[in-house]
Amino acid sequence: MLATIDPIALRLGPISIHWYAICIVSGLLLAVYLAQRLAPEKGINPEHILDFILLAFPIAIVGARLYYVIFQWSYYSQNPSEIFAIWNGGIAIYGGLIAGAAVLYWFAKRHAIAVLDFLDIAAPGVMIAQSIGRWGNFVNQEAYGKAVSQLNYLPEIIRQQMFIDGSYRVPTFLYESLWNLVGFSIILGLRYFNKGLRQGDVTSFYLIWYGLGRFVIEGMRTDSLMFAGLRVSQWVSISIIILGAVLLYFRKQRQKADYKMKN
């Protein structure tokens, strides 16, 4: 039987580099690379991508941590020194997305970039970054599901890491990582095979796909705050699914109106 993975990947004297940080930064770098490759298709200067990331990334991390702390306040109110211990894990993707989206809107307006164009080139990278980032939860043994009797369908390294507090746990991190990976692959397929994608289509797909996955997977977790019979993240998931569907509908209606005007 394998030992659990040390959350610290590397120690350099007093400095500890955590796997959690490596996963986040790796996902970020890949997201930046993809966005810069896609930017010229929308007439966006690739240098704007790096400028945006340097501004948005720290704000998104703060937003993700703030969201997590707010919904775990019963713990952090008793352990205030832990609020800033982000290296121990505990950031909420939705908090980061909300903060990042706010910065993106401001940045796009400031640089006269169409918001939907910016979102369309960002969405593929964000999805693959989320897929990679979930493995940080795996190493930290967090964001898992209910106790189960066995996980024999999984490799031993995952089974052992999901053996927490005397029980095997549903590896919700893995389900979400794979869901996002599939979503990323679909986006690439749509871009390659469907040259008629409209502005906002990729963003709509991202919102609907990610929201559906999170809604289902959050229902398997045991560490999320409940509200009105659902987990808070499930309510947020419903909201972004609706947002994606509404965006898709109105873009379709606009396309029909434009077609009628031309004909």
Curated annotation (Swiss-Prot):
GO BP terms: lipoprotein biosynthetic process
Record field: transmembrane: 15-35, 52-72, 83-103, 112-132, 170-190, 200-220, 230-250
A single GO molecular function term of this UniProt record: phosphatidylglycerol-prolipoprotein diacylglyceryl transferase activity
Membrane-protein topology: Multi-pass membrane protein
Short name of any one Pfam family annotated for the protein: LGT
Positions of a 1,2-diacyl-sn-glycero-3-phospho-(1'-sn-glycerol) binding: 134
A Gene Ontology term for the protein's cellular component: plasma membrane
First-level EC class: transferase
Record keywords, A-Z: Cell membrane, Membrane, Transferase, Transmembrane, Transmembrane helix
EC number: 2.5.1.145
Location of the protein in the cell: Cell membrane
Family that this chain belongs to: Belongs to the Lgt family.
Protein name: Phosphatidylglycerol--prolipoprotein diacylglyceryl transferase
